[in-house]
Amino acid sequence: DVYKRQYLVYPVVGIFLTGLFVRYVVKDDISHGVTKILYAISRRQGRIKRHNTWSSIIASSITIGFGGSVGAEAPIVLTGSAIGSNLGTIFKMEHRTLMLLVGCGAAGAVAGIFKAPIAGLVFTLEVLMIDLTMSSLLPLLISAVTAATVSVSYTHLRAHETGAYL
C-alpha cells in the first residue's frame, strides 16, 4: 500500500517544487513555449526574454524528473529560440538575422531532442514560418544537423566506456 501511494506523492512534490521555482525565482509565466516564440516573432521583433534561456528547461526537468506529465518539445524549443534571440540581441544583429537565429535555435532544439534534423528543419519552416530561401535554409540545416549529431554522439556514451566520468 505504501509503495502504491508513492506514485502519487512524487509528481505532487515535483509540481510543488516547480510552482515555487516559477513563482519565486522566475517570477514570469513560462507556459506555452511555441506560442511565446510566435508572439515574440509577431509582436516583439523576435526578442525573447533572457530568462527563457534557462527557466523553462529547469522547470520542465523538475516536473519530468519527479514523474509529472509535461512534454519535452515546447521547453526545449523555447530554450533554443531564446538562446538564438538573445545572442542576436547581444551582438545587435538586424531583424532578419535575428529571426534566422530564432529559427536556428528552434531547428537545433527539435533536431537534437528527437535526433531528426529534417524534422527540425520542417518544424521551423512550417511553424515559425521562416522564409524558404537558400540564405535561410542553409543555416537552419547546419543548425539541425549539428544538433542531431551532437545529440547522437552524447547519447551513445556509456559510463563504463568513458571511465565513469559522466
Please identify what each model-predicted range represents.
Residues 1-164:
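Alpha-helical transmembrane segments and immediately membrane-proximal extracytoplasmic
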